[in-house]
Each structure stands twice: as structure tokens, then as C-alpha cells.
Amino acid sequence: NTDEYDGIEFELKGNYQQKNRSTILCAARQLGISRESIIKGMATVCETTGLTGRWQTLGTQPLVICDTGHNAGGWQYLAEQISQVECDTCRMVFGMVDDKDMDAVMAMLPKNATYYWTQAETKRAVSSTVIMAKGKEYGLNGTPYPDVISAYRAALTDAASTDFVFVGGSSYVVADLLTRIIQKTT
């Protein structure tokens, strides 16, 4: 039973993290980790471990979120969470790699979004034009971009402060974006 931790702040924000949270709490208690250490660990998991890209907020006006969800299982959770975001326009910076079930993921993507199809800088990346063509099969419309940062910049340029920009589809896409953002600020 993890009820005693219900009010505890968990730094990882994705809806899917609730399942992970329960598993972590159970394991921590079995290992005899103190309540204080559990609370501190839950509140500072990203800072402590360096974990990034899990429903990570990058901006607020517009709301910008990135997530490394990259397969059908992850997108079952992400699609639900994205649908709950209140915004005027949902803008999806999206790319995938070649060993994932593109059809299964595409079927879960929001139909009412504007897409900025992209590709990460890895040999495994599916080209943005191939992803765009696959997206059209699912009624998803957008423009292809040769790299993540140009797709991201285009989405930000087009976005109003009341829009939502999501970056994801692949861990590589999120890594490319976060690397460029870090390089820009250091």
C-alpha cells in the first residue's frame, strides 16, 4: 500500500509515471529505505540521476513538453495525456526510428494537430518525408524538416502563447533537441 505517499511531489510528471511510482515505492520499502529518503528521491529524481526527456516542460507560453516515448506501449499513455492538454493548437514535432511500429504509433497520434515531421541525427532515423507520407495515411498533416532543431524552431515560430508544442516520437529526437538547447545556453 502506497497511500501514505499520495501527497508526495514526484518530479517525473507523465501520467504513466503513476504506475512507475507505485513500483518504486514498493521496492524502496522492501529495501528498507527511509520515508525521508524516499520523499527526497521522488522530488529530485531528475537532478539526482540526470534523467531528462520524460514529460519534461521546456516552456510555458507556449507550453512546450518533450517526451522520449517511442513505442506503442508508451504512446498509449502519451496520447491520453496529450489529449488532456488545454490549448488552442497542438503542434507536434515528431520523428521515429526504423525499428519501431510506426503504424501502431501513428494510429494513436492526435488528428487535430499540426505536424512538424523531423528526423534525428542517427542512421536509424526514418526520413521526415517518409514519416510525413505515413502520417498522411492516418490523416495527419504537416511539413517535413531535415532536422529536429529546424522543426522545433518552426513550431515555436508558428505557435501562439496559448498553443501546445510537443517534441517526441523517439528518444533520439528528444536527445537532439535537448543537446541543442544545452549547447545554446552554455
Give residue ranges: language-model regions.
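Short glycine-/acidic-enriched loop or helix-start segments at secondary-structure transitions
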Residues: 75-76, 102-104, 127-128, 176-179
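Active-site catalytic pocket residues across diverse enzymes, especially alpha/beta-hydrolases
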Residues: 31, 82, 135, 159, ...
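Surface-exposed, flexible loop/turn segments at secondary-structure boundaries
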Residues: 98-100, 123, 150, 173
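Glycine/aspartate-rich loop-and-adjacent alpha/beta segment that forms the canonical ThDP
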Residues: 170-186
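Glycine-rich beta-strand-to-loop/alpha-helix junction loops that act as flexible
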Residues: 94-97, 167-171
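Nucleotide phosphate-binding/pyrophosphate-handling subdomain across enzymes
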Residues: 4-114
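C-terminal helical cap/extension that packs against the catalytic core
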Residues: 63-64, 105-164
